[in-house]
Amino acid sequence: MKLIIAGGRDFSDRLLLKKEVEAFINEQSVSLSDVEVVSGVAKGADTLGEAWGFVSGVKVKIFPPDWNRHGKAAGPIRNREMAEYATHCIVFWDGKSRGAKS
C-alpha cells in the first residue's frame, strides 16, 4: 500500500493521525511491512505522516514541490504526481485549507 498522508499545514494532532492511520491500515488488512508513506513534505499533516512512518518502521517516499522549476504550479503538479504514484490517501482537512482540498 502506497499511502498518502496529507492535510492542512496547521494540523498538529499526532495522536489523531496515529489512531486514524493505524485504523485505516488495519481495515485494509495490510501489514506494516507492506506500507509506504507518501508525503508532499509540507508542514503539518504531511510531516506528521512522515514522522509516523519513520517511527513505525515503514518506508517513506517524499515528493517535494519544485518551486524553482514550476513556480506557483509546483504544489498542484506535486499533488498530481503523488496521486498517480499512491494507491491510497488519507487527508486531515479542516474544511478550509485549499492545498489539502486539492
Name each model feature, range by range:
Residues 2-3, 10-102:
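Acidic/glycine-enriched connector segments
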